[in-house]
Amino acid sequence: MFCPFCSEQETKVIDSRLVAEGQQVRRRRECMVCHERFTTFESAELVMPRVIKRDGSREPFNEDKLRAGLQRALEKRPVSTEKVEQCILSLKSQLRATGEREVSSELLGNLIMKALKELDKVAYVRFASVYRSFEDIREFGEEIARLGD
């Protein structure tokens, strides 16, 4: 790595530590020429698959959109922010594990519903009602009945 002070290429790692819950490595480096010290952060570049929407259009995976959808479904429910963040990490991991460059919005929606079913059943029904476009109260009842099975 190049020294940010003198642009020399030869630097030495003098300390490494895991940070960000093990998602990054913090390294203290020293330039072998000017002896200045600096910090670098290293993390894996994990490429998320693109999402193929119902109309056939494609868009990049949007973590903020996922978070907003989960928060909307979980509004006024007793689920901690920490659990929501764990859910997001798990969903992203499942998407990457498909090994595909593109995934359907249907697959993503089903993964979200499965996660919400385990997290909070009321939030699951809220999300399912929008995702599956429930037309009347009967469809709500059928979904709630399936939860009891």
UniProtKB/Swiss-Prot annotation:
GO terms for molecular function: ATP binding; DNA binding; zinc ion binding. Binds 1 zinc ion. A zinc finger (unnamed) spans 3-34. InterPro entries: ATP-cone_dom, NrdR-like_N, RNR_NrdR-like. PROSITE patterns: ATP_CONE. It holds the Pfam family Zn_ribbon_NrdR. Its cofactor is Zn(2+). Residues 49-139 form the ATP-cone domain. Keywords: ATP-binding, DNA-binding, Metal-binding, Nucleotide-binding, Repressor, Transcription, Transcription regulation, Zinc, Zinc-finger. One of its GO terms (biological process) is negative regulation of DNA-templated transcription. Negatively regulates transcription of bacterial ribonucleotide reductase nrd genes and operons by binding to NrdR-boxes. Belongs to the NrdR family. This is Transcriptional repressor NrdR. The gene is nrdR1.
